[in-house]
Amino acid sequence: MEDKLEARFQELEEKLKNLTQEDRARVRDAFDYARSHHEGQLRKDGSPYITHPLEVAHLVAELGLDADSIMAALLHDTIEDTDATHEEVAKRFSETVADLVEGVTKLTKVKYTSTEEKQM
């Protein structure tokens, strides 16, 4: 499975040609960090949990968003579902990335009473 994960990450890298080499390295670091922190976690289908953040990162990259957004996609469940902290993510990546990760976590906790509210 590691080979498949690495191949899928390399496919993501192909979408990052517009980023600087430094930003591509930061995205790689975020992937490695998330993979390490999600080690042993599985999705309902039995696949490694990291496949979900990696697919989200693909979607974010396809939207043409910046490196911080792609990194936040990779890291979006680390603070909520692992022992990673906001402070640790901020120190390693940036305060912006940590804030984006926190924001995604908070969005998932919003409860809507109607479809109309959800779409706003």
Task: Locate predicted features.
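Active-site helical microenvironments for divalent-metal-assisted chemistry
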Residues: 1-120
